[in-house]
Amino acid sequence: MDHLKRQDEKVFAAIEAELGRQRSKIELIASENFVSEAVMEAQGSVLTNKYAEGYPGKRYYGGCEHVDVVEDIARDRVKEIFGAEHVNVQPHSGAQANMAVYFTILEQGDTVLGMNLSHGGHLTHGSPVNFSGVQYNFVEYGVDADSHRINYDDVLAKAKEHKPKLIVAGASAYPRVIDFKRFREIADEVGAYLMVDMAHIAGLVAAGLHPNPVPHAHFVTTTTHKTLRGPRGGMILCEEKFAKQIDKSIFPGIQGGPLMHVIAAKAVAFGETLQEDFKTYAQNIINNANRLAEGLQKEGLTLVSGGTDNHLILIDVRNLEITGKVAEHVLDEVGITVNKNTIPFETASPFVTSGVRIGTAAVTSRGFGLEEMDEIASLIAYTLKNHENEAALEEARKRVEALTSKFSMYPNL
């Protein structure tokens, strides 16, 4: 980044500092990952200069013949990965992908069934502080009080009672497999559409390690980062009969010109997803998550639902007599990055919380394996149990440094 260094030392310094943070800390935020240098090169390309309102073959600007190729590559690769009939890769985020689906089939005030945020849902699944909860009448379903797993009988009962126009499946903090076939059966029984938000598990679905929602849902939304290991962005997969409506909802509905440099980066990431070694990577994500969960439980920590089926683990820290906020802070102090998170039947403020959410996608990209998961489990437990002991925290910092020093990060940057 020689040009940037000469042009703007302040921005360059901030980027260099962030690179140092990523190299020196253990990244366990479940929604984060490390993209390839090829993805970064595509996103930093001259495509950032091009306006391309519209879609391939039907643009409102001239000179789009090359970006048309890029967008077609991205769409075709997604169709191949997931078996989708239609794909829109223009959403700038997962939230905008969800918004576009809502705008396609809902009217203001329509009833929607979505997962409670503290039970694992997402802001865009009906939170009252989000546009979704303001514009529409969301009814919440959740998890069983004992198993912390989705109670499908309860979902059916609520669907029969409230007759939603749309049912939203998918989550941002649910560590178990979701039965999309069952959700579609429930939707069909009450005459509702089904939308699946697979943002967190898309990479696992792509690798065949989690049930694919595409054959069951009318609409599937996702981010393109997280387990897909692409640039930050979103996309929509749907049945062909909804293609024109979905495309109109994105443009001109809620967006103007697409970010063609980001779409190029998405295309590159999708190409990586189609490679055989991506399946190995995704399997390692799950293996690492299972090993980490086992290690945490051996250390006496409480896990929501008792474990994980995917990349995500939710730790209930109440038995340690600390809050999620304190846990996040003290772990960051020793070099482990996590996020505080609400847990099912939460009683604390969302700014405080009773839980911590972690995931294994990023550390797996870095090359961490089962032995490293054992050490991370030990480190997390040691740090949280000794959160007021500065000598213990200094020891944890040294252990984190010893671990991260074994795995290089972006050596060419």
Swiss-Prot record:
SS bonds (residue pairs): none
Gene3D superfamilies tied to this protein: Aspartate Aminotransferase, domain 1, Type I PLP-dependent aspartate aminotransferase-like (Major domain)
Leading EC class: transferase
EC number: 2.1.2.1
Keyword match Cytoplasm: yes
Main location: cytoplasm
Record-marked site positions (Plays an important role in substrate specificity): 225
One BP annotation, GO: glycine biosynthetic process from serine
Quaternary structure note: Homodimer.
Protein name stated in the entry: Serine hydroxymethyltransferase
Species: Bacillus cereus (strain G9842)
Gene, per the UniProt record: glyA
